Swiss-Prot record:
Keyword tags: Isomerase, Lactose metabolism
Chemical reaction(s) catalysed: aldehydo-D-galactose 6-phosphate = keto-D-tagatose 6-phosphate
A Pfam family matched in the record: LacAB_rpiB
Molecular-function GO term, any one: ribose-5-phosphate isomerase activity
Gene Ontology biological process terms in this record: D-allose catabolic process; galactose catabolic process; lactose catabolic process via tagatose-6-phosphate; pentose-phosphate shunt, non-oxidative branch
Name of the protein described by the UniProt record: Galactose-6-phosphate isomerase subunit LacB
InterPro entries: LacB, RpiB_LacA_LacB, RpiB_LacA_LacB_sf
EC assignment: 5.3.1.26
Segment forming the signal sequence: none
Assembly: Heteromultimeric protein consisting of LacA and LacB.
Source organism per UniProt: Streptococcus pneumoniae (strain Taiwan19F-14)
Chain's gene name: lacB
Length: 171
């Protein structure tokens, strides 16, 4: 399995630790940088990771910045990416099993290296569990990302909101 990884200058050391962990587990790591602490901008590396995943160069991606918010927003702008910003196992597994996430994002100054490694390994081994409901949710996400004309419809999310109101979704 090939895993693309990228970060900004704030978490280079954390990214290197994660990269070494993945290599020790036998994964091929495609490291898009950054490689030092020279100030840079996370959108560059989020985009590179996202493009590697959607092109098939990598099977999954890992993005890390200080809080995870910036790089995760950047990678999610790449059409075809479904990235989840996580800091716990439950969220990571939900993202992969229910939403077929193909990138996982972390705040390297929020989540410790060992926990990131444990979560990434679980994310890699988790499998998407398709259902009619999550297929519809993923389709809605894809319609938004492709600027589908339906998204200008004021009722675009009505079906899901009605199901929520009826108690069909549970936290």
């Amino acid at each position: 399995m090939r895993i693309a990884i990228g970060c900004d200058h704030i978490v280079t050391d954390e990214k290197m630790a994660v990269s070494e962990f993945l290599k020790s587990k036998g994964y091929e790591v495609i490291d898009f940088g950054t490689y030092d602490h020279t100030r840079t901008h996370y959108p560059i590396f989020g985009k590179k990771v996202g493009e590697a995943v959607t092109s098939g160069q990598a099977d999954l991606g890992v993005c890390i910045c200080g809080t995870g918010v910036g790089i995760n927003n950047a990678v999610n702008k790449v059409p075809g990416v479904r990235s989840a910003l996580v800091r716990d196992m439950t969220t990571a597994l939900y993202a992969k099993e229910q939403l077929n996430a193909n990138v996982i994002g972390f705040g390297g100054k929020i989540t410790g290296e060992l926990l990131m490694c444990d979560i990434i390994e679980a994310f890699i081994h988790a499998e998407y569990k398709p259902s009619e409901e999550n297929k519809k949710l993923i389709a809605k996400i894809e319609h938004v990302e492709t600027h589908n004309a339906q998204q200008t419809d004021a009722n675009f999310f009505t079906e899901f909101l009605e199901k929520w109101d009826r108690g069909e979704y549970h936290d």
